[in-house]
Design a protein with these regions (language model features):
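N-terminal alpha/beta PP-like core and its mobile active-site loop of ThDP/TPP-dependent enzymes
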Residues: 1-261
């Protein structure tokens, strides 16, 4: 009966979620996981500092409108990720951060590079959790992707103890039941009453300006926004997180028509 290591299970689970590219800085205990990702056909993008991996993942997600994955070694590798992860939290970017950690069996004994990585990640993520059993790795990976995308997008963190990554388990014991489950796409709708009230306010407004943020980007509503702008002829301004949803050289761009607003 074939067996898989935790690292191999992690790589296969990421592949099932549609991951094509991985941003990381090689280091233990993630070396086998990173090698396994490459064997699964995931393109490795190795950086010189973990913070760069998180920022590159953030840019990747914004450009492709989908989750990205960054990976780091235990201890200082994970702490180096935090600034990039925190930035993704502020900008509502679905970044999946995966960090190696000291062995689960020796937690609390101050072993090599042991630090409370979960405690540091929780304030700057939507969800942070640790892998406890090999059989549930695919489930945990899918939940991480689900949490990153549901509602307002944002970063998540999955902590992977080194001893679990190198342990083996029979393939038939692995739970793949929700691996690769379709991701939610947040497109919230206002009630008809609020929409009617908004229309009434716009009818009586003298110098309206539309201000849009990153929600337009993540809900994939750029075309709807542009249609609304052009039908109403209301100038628009985008926050830094929402730039590019309508071309900035559009005749109704705030930078172009601000003197008429």
């Amino acid at each position: 009966m074939a067996q898989l290591t935790g690292s191999e299970i992690l790589a296969k689970a990421l592949k099932n979620e549609g991951v094509e590219d991985l941003f990381f800085l090689m280091g233990g205990p993630m070396l086998l996981a990173e090698e396994s990702c490459i064997k699964e056909g995931i393109r490795p993008i190795d950086v010189r500092h973990e913070q760069a991996a998180a920022f590159m993942g953030q840019a990747y997600s914004r450009l492709l409108n989908k989750p990205s994955v960054c990976m780091a070694a235990s201890g200082p590798g994970v702490t180096n990720l935090i600034t990039g992860v925190a930035n993704a939290f502020v900008d509502c970017v679905p970044l999946v951060a995966i960090g190696g950690s000291s062995p689960f069996k020796t937690y609390g004994q101050q072993v090599f590079q042991e630090i409370d990585q979960l405690g540091m990640m929780k304030p700057c993520t939507k969800w942070a959790e640790r892998v406890y059993t090999l059989s549930r790795i695919p489930e945990m990976v899918n939940v991480a992707f689900q949490k990153a995308m549901v509602g307002k997008p944002g970063p998540v963190y999955l902590d992977c103890p080194g001893d679990l990554l190198y342990e083996k388990i029979d393939e038939e014991e692995i739970d793949w039941s929700i691996s690769g489950r379709a991701l939610p796409r947040a497109r919230p709708h206002a009630s008809s009453e609020i929409i009617d009230e908004t229309i009434d306010v716009l009818r009586t407004a003298e110098r309206p300006v539309i201000i849009t943020g990153g929600g337009i980007l993540w809900s994939d509503a750029s075309s709807e926004l542009q249609e609304f702008v052009e039908k109403t002829q209301i100038p628009f301004y985008t926050t830094p997180q929402g730039r590019g949803v309508i071309p900035e050289d559009h005749p109704l761009s705030f930078m172009t028509v601000r003197s008429a607003a």
